[in-house]
A protein has these predicted regions:
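Catalytic cores of extracellular degradative/oxidative enzymes
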Residues: 1-279, 284-285
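Blade-level signature of beta-propeller repeat domains, shared across WD40, Kelch, NHL, RCC1
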Residues: 290-291
Length: 291
């Protein structure tokens, strides 16, 4: 799946919980494949990855969420594999590709969404992927320039008109400073389920343990607590992203919210089709043996 739904992460977290060697082997294979094969290492797209492909590199969306260092951190820190370390170094300045390649050029063209910033991105999955790259470079080398870039982003997001709900999805960004801006209607709001299902949630939570920016923490907690309701209000989104509400419930010590998050894992949202969770046995001659 080219890391599209954070499969590397859930494999590694599963290994850390269980210690199972079969999970280790799968996580290792995924890490090596997605880090070495699904990412461009030379050429105009170097530092980015390609997703949604039937064949490799077929998708026009060359994005940081595929190449981000977050996928490789587990394997590197558990093995000190230097090749893996090189792959993380490769992407430390991948945000500079935004000068030439706008991830929202088709979905939200500049002609329709005013922006005089030198580049554009989404808070997630784009900025969170870049921030994970910077966090990794900072912790591996001690280069505080990358830490400062994260801080600039956190502080600028915290003062946006609607913080993490600020619309449109494509916001102004300056790769030289790390500052995020908007020039659109300050009343415009948006939600994006992709923000926190592609490694962004885990990276943000780890960053907040390393960098204490109260206004960012407040913005992140507010987004987690209100995401489900806001997503339904704005677009009738069926993606509830239950871990956001669970996170908010824990930090707010809100039992009712915790119960709702747990319930959401097993029930469907009103007005949406029920998930087709059915177990079907397929028998020969359709398959060689029962499946």
């Amino acid at each position: 799946d080219n890391t599209e739904l954070a499969s590397n992460m859930w494999l590694w977290y599963n290994f850390l919980r269980t210690g199972r060697i079969d999970i280790w082997r799968m996580a290792e294979a995924m890490t090596r494949h997605t880090g070495e094969v699904d990412v461009y290492h030379i050429g105009p797209n170097a530092g980015l990855g390609s997703r949604h492909n039937v064949s490799h590199w077929g998708c026009g969306a060359k994005e940081a969420r595929i190449s981000q260092a977050a996928w490789n951190r587990f394997y590197y820190y558990l093995t000190t594999d230097e090749r893996c370390g090189d792959l993380m170094t490769e992407v430390k300045d991948a945000d500079h590709k935004l000068y030439d390649l706008d991830p929202m050029r088709l979905a939200q063209p500049r002609s329709e969404y005013p922006c005089t910033a030198p580049a554009r991105l989404r808070i997630g999955p784009d900025w969170l992927a870049y921030a994970g790259n910077w966090m990794t470079e900072w912790e591996r080398t001690g280069n505080t320039a990358y830490r400062d870039k994260i801080i600039a982003g956190m502080k600028s997001i915290a003062v946006l008109p609607n913080r993490l709900f600020t619309g449109p999805k494509a916001l102004g960004f300056d790769p030289s400073t790390g500052i995020i801006t908007t020039e659109c209607d300050p009343k415009l709001e948006t939600t994006n389920h992709l923000m926190t299902i592609m490694g962004g949630f885990e990276i943000a939570n780890e960053m907040m343990r390393m960098i204490d920016i109260p206004e960012w923490k407040d913005a992140w907690l507010d987004h987690a607590a209100r995401y489900k309701k806001k997503a339904w209000e704005l677009s009738h989104s069926r993606f509830r992203v239950s871990h956001l509400m669970a996170y908010a419930a824990y930090h707010l010590r809100n039992t009712q919210m915790a119960e709702e998050a747990w319930k959401d894992l097993f029930t469907r949202l009103e007005h949406t089709p029920a998930p087709p969770f059915r177990i079907t046995t397929i028998l020969p001659p359709e398959v060689p043996s029962p499946l």
